[in-house]
Amino acid sequence: MNKIKYTTALLLGGLLSFSSCTDNFADFNSTDGAYTEELQKYDNQTNLVPFATIQKGIIYQTGVDGTDWQYQVIQNLVADMFCGYFHDMNGSFNANNSTYNLNNGWTSAMWIYTYGYVMPSIADAEALNTEKEWPLYHAITKILKVATLHRVSDYYGPILYDGFGTADQKPQSQEEVYKRFFEDLETAVNILKDYKGGVSFESADFMMPEGKRTPAQWLKFANSLRLRLAMRVSNVAPELAEKQAKAALDAANGGVLETANETVGEYGIRNPLGGVAGWSEVYMNASLESFLKGYNDPRLKSYFNPAQDGRDKDGNINKEVAGVKQLSSIEDEYKGVRQGTGVADNRYSTHSQTTLSLIHISEPTRQA
């Protein structure tokens, strides 16, 4: 009998002890400094959290050292080569995009990273920031969505725009998607031009220049993007293009970006072209040389270094390259590599290299 009493007492003691331990169970199992849901509610952080990922995803760059290759396969080895902006000098790439033999892994990267990394955050921002409750964040979400996905549509044509992540999602034609771009931009413009203040986006904004992280500046960006897209469809839908261009340029809608100090970029994020240039895999394309030199574009000296005649990429005197003498003197000239040139990579050592290593990422409105 005594044994039973003692056993019962021990069990009750254990239960009481366990109960006292679990009184603070949530505290014991939390991490000091964790960004909890409760903390995210302060200063509207719950609503703002998705925007960092979205802004970094337009010109894809996570900002972490060692991730430049993602930008390279999304943008530099695809659109930049195909459009004649740059040419790589990696000899192993000569059988791929720079000679018009498209690499499926590179050409699919834009879709994979946008829909795997950026679109979930856009969907979160759409769900969190309704027009009624959070009009400013709602408008900026729409602008960023268009800024992100117009680039994807220009790669692939039909894309997933509406209904992402739902059971009935389906691709929409490029014609339909462009109409949706204009609808969303019009909604954003109407919200922003009538916005009377309240919440701020400044703490989450790293696309507008410091001192201009305001709804008025986002309004200008929306109009500039609207004008850009109108120009894109001018040859296939001239009436739509005219309507949208006039709306974008209507002073009553807030104006467009016009001055150098209004440059839209990704401020504070390392330019991935600097990393790619460090691998000696991005040189000026001859097509870009033709435009920049032909129009005496003042940006030429900021974008590229002049060629070095008779020197290899390490600066050593090298009058013969791969056993072949230099055909002409191009020292101190700005020379690009002709698209489709499939020669040994050390033949490119004299051409103009990019100088973008210390410049913030180019503004989304100027990217192909």
PLM features: residue spans?
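Membrane-proximal, proline-rich intrinsically disordered regions
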Residues: C21-C83
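Bacterial Sec-dependent N-terminal signal peptides
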Residues: M1-S30
